[in-house]
Amino acid sequence: MDAKLSPNQGLNISGIGLASSLAAGLGIAALTLDWMANRNPWQGTSLTLPLLLCTIASAIAGYFVVPLLQALKTGQIIREDGPQAHLKKAGTPTMGGIFFIPVAVVGACVLSNFATEVLAVSALTLSYGLIGWIDDWQILRRKSNKGISPRMKLALQIGFAAAFCLWLMFNQPANITSIALPWVSFALPLGFLFWPLAGFVLVAESNATNLTDGIDGLAGGTVAIALLALGAIVAPTSPALMVFCAALSGSCLGFLAHNRNPARVFMGDTGSLALGGALAAVALLTNSLVALFILSGIFFVETLSVMAQVSYYKATKGPDGKGKRLLKMAPLHHHLELSGWSELQVVSSFYVIAAILAAICLAIASGGA
């Protein structure tokens, strides 16, 4: 990890080239998955059409919204103790989630004929996006990296998670509290314990994607991969949520037209909290928690790197009040940057890992079908 790498060693690709490759790869994957499932890729209830339409719509929306965000002076506050290469990003507008999240929600609702489960997941997604927007707005208003207090943010996340769980409790079959295990015809019955687990998953997933959003194109691309795979997995039991996942995946791709390196806009907490909430909500509603765990491997490692860094620092704190660090900086992607990796090396590597995790998930799903 500490090996010094030149900025483009072993990677002769630009930000737009990487984003285009991802979009092409996911487009081909969507077509292939539709073909394998005997779905018409050009009908609303598919992976391909929602992905394509929302990619285009999100990219077009960005060409109008990004200049508006610039005019409103919503420039991101950059941490001075972070990678020095990030200082040049100062002034890049944030809150990009305000355009690509609504595009996906509207697209999914229309293409699914306003299915009840899509409306519920959309409400949770927008609610978490609202929490992120409040946090982003406070950061901009105070001109610092401090938005709303962590306690307030957590309280809002738990509150919206509880509301979603209440909807699940009264509108879904009783067996939703049993977790399906792949490859075996057995479900782990959790009973009442399912509900605190569900709340934890919603809060943890949203915070994990939030921590991953630290490099141009990183969160948007990895979440797009996870969403498309999750959409394919839930398709047999919930075609409407397949459409939602494909639409949000496409909207992430459209956002990358503006967020790829060098980024013209950041998604901010407005986008990252919403994306994590969406992933968790779909998984809970479709009994796909095992799939979510695998697909979120990158987000969990990023979160664990922060937890390990903080815990080790506190455990090794001496009389002078200073402790030792496991990593040069947390989350992991910043450690890699400070170890000599370029942003494109980190992002492309994480894309490959996300694709491998998606392939593993799809293989497990097909094996258990």
From Swiss-Prot:
GO terms for molecular function: metal ion binding; phospho-N-acetylmuramoyl-pentapeptide-transferase activity; UDP-N-acetylmuramoyl-L-alanyl-D-glutamyl-meso-2,6-diaminopimelyl-D-alanyl-D-alanine:undecaprenyl-phosphate transferase activity. The keyword Hydrolase does not apply. Keywords: Cell cycle, Cell division, Cell inner membrane, Cell membrane, Cell shape, Cell wall biogenesis/degradation, Magnesium, Membrane, Metal-binding, Peptidoglycan synthesis, Transferase, Transmembrane, Transmembrane helix. The chain crosses the membrane at residues 13-33, 49-69, 95-115, 119-139, 154-174, 183-203, 215-235, 237-257, 281-301, 346-366. It is found in: Cell inner membrane. Pfam families: Glycos_transf_4, MraY_sig1. One of its GO terms (cellular component) is plasma membrane. Its cofactor is Mg(2+). It is a multi-pass membrane protein. Pathway: Cell wall biogenesis; peptidoglycan biosynthesis. It is an enzyme of class 2 (transferase). The keyword Ribonucleoprotein does not apply. Its main location: membrane. Belongs to the glycosyltransferase 4 family. MraY subfamily. PANTHER family: PHOSPHO-N-ACETYLMURAMOYL-PENTAPEPTIDE-TRANSFERASE, PHOSPHO-N-ACETYLMURAMOYL-PENTAPEPTIDE-TRANSFERASE HOMOLOG. HAMAP family: MraY. This is Phospho-N-acetylmuramoyl-pentapeptide-transferase. It comes from Nostoc sp. (strain PCC 7120 / SAG 25.82 / UTEX 2576).
